[in-house]
Curated annotation (Swiss-Prot):
Domain of life: Bacteria
InterPro entries recorded: 3-OHacyl-CoA_DH_CS (IPR006180), 3-OHacyl-CoA_DH_NAD-bd (IPR006176), 3HC_DH_C (IPR006108), 6-PGluconate_DH-like_C_sf (IPR008927), ClpP/crotonase-like_dom_sf (IPR029045), Enoyl-CoA_hydra/iso (IPR001753), FA_oxidation_alpha_subunit (IPR050136), FadB (IPR012799)
Pathway(s) where this gene product acts: Lipid metabolism; fatty acid beta-oxidation
Record carries keyword Membrane: no
Binding annotation for substrate: 296, 501, 661
Subunit note: Heterotetramer of two alpha chains (FadB) and two beta chains (FadA).
Any Pfam family: 3HCDH_N
Organism: Vibrio cholerae serotype O1 (strain ATCC 39315 / El Tor Inaba N16961)
Entry protein name: Fatty acid oxidation complex subunit alpha
Region (Enoyl-CoA hydratase/isomerase): 1-189
Amino acid sequence: MIYQAKTLQVKQLANGIAELSFCAPASVNKLDLHTLESLDKALDALAADSSVKGLLLSSDKEAFIVGADITEFLGLFAKPEAELDEWLQFANRIFNKLEDLPFPTLSALKGHTLGGGCECVLATDFRIGDATTSIGLPETKLGIMPGFGGTVRLPRLIGADSAMEIITQGKACRAEEALKVGLLDAIVDSDKLIDSAITTLTQAIEEKLDWQKRRQQKTSALTLSKLEAMMSFTMAKGMVAQVAGKHYPAPMTSVVTIEEAARLPRDAALDIERKHFIKLAKSTEAQALVGIFLNDQYIKGLAKQSAKAASQDTQHAAVLGAGIMGGGIAYQSALKGVPVLMKDIAPHSLELGMTEAAKLLNKQLERGKIDGFKMAGILASITPSLHYAGIDQADVIVEAVVENPKVKAAVLSEVEGLVDTETILTSNTSTIPINLLAKSLKRPQNFCGMHFFNPVHRMPLVEIIRGEHTSEDTINRVVAYAAKMGKSPIVVNDCPGFFVNRVLFPYFAGFSLLMRDGANFTEIDKVMERQFGWPMGPAYLLDVVGIDTAHHAQAVMAEGFPTRMAKSGREAIDALYEAKKFGQKNGSGFYQYTVDKKGKPKKAFSDDVLAILAPVCGAPQSFDPQTLIERTMIPMINEVVLCLEEGIIASAQEADMALVYGLGFPPFRGGVFRYLDTIGIANYVAMAEKYADLGALYQVPQLLKNMAQQGTSFYSAQQVSAL
């Protein structure tokens, strides 16, 4: 043994070849601080051993290295710039040391080789992998960019254009693509990976392969003419500006970094990379996006805990109520391997549900995600039925009938009598209290809410609503089932609107108050989309939700929270509802909708709506963008904080992920609690108090006032991952 540490070891093989194997005691290998320090010492030991003629890098895991340890990021990023610079220099010295070893080096890859793992193997002379290999640099998805030499070595290895595509998109290349672009030198069978690696290294040691020429290419300047460089970088900047936009600076910064370093040798190029990395690491976007990653891990950790604690796994499911929503739920369950009975009283609804499932599967087929055999198998695992035969096989039943409390209660009560005492019943509802529906059941402990978002196949969030009598095992089993479906389940306590709709309607109320005061709805949409970063402004979102749906939900919220959410008079939603302008669903709401060539609704403004809205709108008045943002967001932010204060949602992490996954809250802002930390809670309190005269929705919760006085925040700089 040449060197041994907790997460890696170096041993001597035959013919002067040494093997450095990453072997962390955890389920995956990560390039955390400890592993980097161990790698540094291992490379020193190798350089000092004159018997070593070649080095093989390998892994004892299914994945080579999944990347750096992201749980360390926020703590590192919070350090002074000088300390961050030192850390990056330390890491780069290690990879330079690997690249500069006086003998050939090769990485034998399998599974994921991502982020810092990819940057590590870029420092070796050769890379071979098996068919499972996936190699890439996902850092821009976290608001940062490669910082261990990725922007320097990758363009010199595979060319600037291919490198910029991989880096700016945060893309991982599968084995065949990696071979095509030059990231891999060969793909071999898994059982021959190490033997092939040794053969290749032996050829390099015997100088049958020119490893020094390869190394020279990676440590020199890029070989681009001035014209080639101008065309390449101009085109890349144009593409990135169009796709990433101004709220996500990391992709553009990556292009600028590669451009600035193009004519420099390795060490000077690494200085450029380090400078830009530090700037991104200190950005609020990076804090938010890294925070989202960690929060997502937290949610997954909670789901794993629930699955472990659950009394049984869900092997069979049932959906009551077909149509688009029922079909979407059935599709998602079947796709992830849980057969499902889809029951409805109307043949045309069953047909619609099966058509929806088939349509979604056809899209998967067209994209090459599944083959025809797999598609047929998934469709066969959805059983449409007009009767309850087979319902007793279901471990979890999702009721998804019409949004009417009497109908839902009747269906739930009926099906409860047909299943055994272990079966879990859930209701897919957006507005009906779970405690109300539970009154119709003999076993309310086996019942909870399971609120899917539309379209089911695309929206990651499922709200799991705990009723007054819901047992912990019911919650655990339903959370585990939602996770098995590939969803992000978040548990909330029962209240009108649950969490997502409860916090959404104050946002709509702020929008309505602005219109009452003379603001133009198209201007509000423009500001909330382009400046704040919502995928849709409030008027557009109301059209997509459906004006009729929103009108009904608004009444539910007003009844549930009369102090804050009761209307003071007719509003824009009322005017459109009365005019039967229901939004996208019937082609007319705030905007007019026509179907484009792809069958998607396209919106356009029409003056016709102004006459309908005139009675509920004040005289036209101009507001600056910041005022529009503040007046729409403060009611939502206050309500989110109240939900945490009241225990409707358990943590800031879960609330922020529910907002991002359920409402499309701008990821670069990280959710309401991350946003509050970013702008400063004391600053928020002072800002919100300027609008106190607008009513109860604008009253700052006591929790925020206390935190402002104490100078505390929701997230500490050293945020750790879950569980």
